[in-house]
A protein has these predicted regions:
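Charge-dense, helix-prone N-terminal extensions
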Residues: 1-191
């Protein structure tokens, strides 16, 4: 389905906001085309695109290269249970203070606050090791030592992966895999 989504090219932040205002409620998502800095210095910036998306309840994800001069990034309506990063929560607070949030964006925040997805990454962002992982690491001292020595970004990657498990069995599997990888001093699941 992602590949079938429309590519949209806008030249600046106001044009992107206009597109979102017009289409946020009806579009399943789009690939937003970005110019690379070397090609067009006065381009739409990623941070600006994300902020405008948040204003309408949308979020960014996958990036793909188009050419030497352009790339695309997937923007879609935020799912009700999608998690909120610390950075996006800070952006939303600032945008709300500046009175730039639109009703759809405010509704997405209200939904997230009501269902708990607004806070679901707080422990991950704070690098708090959950009890199940702490106990499993304690049983394998080399894994515990390696995990503790990992850079914050590496630990956060593992903690996020574990926190996103939907079923207890999946979470237990991810905890075991994290311990096994940490014992091998693998700083990432993709190493």
């Amino acid at each position: 389905m992602r590949d079938a989504l429309e590519q949209v090219y806008v030249t600046d932040r106001p044009a992107w906001r206009r597109w979102l205002v017009q289409h946020h409620a009806s579009s399943p998502g789009i690939w937003l085309v970005f110019d690379r800095a070397t090609h067009r210095p006065d381009r739409l910036l990623y941070a600006d695109a994300v902020e405008e998306a948040l204003c309408t309840g949308w979020i960014d994800s996958t990036v793909r290269s188009l050419s030497d001069t352009q790339y695309v990034q997937l923007f879609t309506p935020r799912k009700p249970t999608s998690t909120w990063s610390r950075l996006n929560k800070e952006r939303v607070a600032r945008l709300a203070a500046e009175d730039r949030m639109l009703p759809a964006g405010l509704a997405a925040v209200a939904t997230a606050t009501a269902n708990g997805s607004w806070e679901s990454l707080d422990a991950v962002e704070a690098l708090i090791v959950p009890d199940d992982l702490a106990n499993a690491l304690a049983a394998v001292p080399v894994a515990a030592a390696n995990f503790a020595a990992f850079a914050p970004a590496s630990r956060k990657g593992y903690l996020h992966w574990i926190s996103q498990a939907k079923r207890p069995e999946t979470r237990a599997t991810r905890v075991r895999e994290t311990v096994a990888l940490a014992a091998q001093n693998q700083k990432s699941r993709h190493s």
